[in-house]
């Protein structure tokens, strides 16, 4: 005969296992999204400057700037800058296409963050090389939270 205590404990465990996603799944999904963007090219750390506050009070509108020092000439320029996140419902936050006429490889926007997480900015160069910068951001009031 099952006791009430056993039923309640089993139900709580089942609910917890459905609602809680392991952090490794988020990290694996983030790495997979970055790798898919790179298209098989190795993603190396460096060359990307990623400006975002390390502590964000409200995740609903977070200013972000990504810069890549590049001469932006026909022979050497940034073709794409992408921003990825670890915990939002979709891993790709933004994707910007650039060319030599852009003059500077700098993009600014505002994003939403679903809690404290890791962000990755990746720059793809015209020769196929990919450079990245990873930043951890603490968010006190989350956005993008699924019910």
In which residue ranges do the predicted regions lie?
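Short beta-strand edge segments in extracellular beta-sheet folds
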Residues: 136-140
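Short edge beta-strand/loop segments characteristic of extracellular beta-sandwich folds
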Residues: 63-71
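Extracellular Ig-like/FN3 beta-sandwich strand-entry sites
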Residues: 114-118
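Short acidic/polar inter-strand loop motif in beta-rich domains
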Residues: 126-132
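An anionic, turn-rich surface loop/hairpin at beta-sheet edges
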Residues: 89-112
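N-terminal secretory signal peptides and thylakoid transit peptides that target proteins
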Residues: 1-18
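Transition segment at domain starts
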Residues: 24-59, 96-97
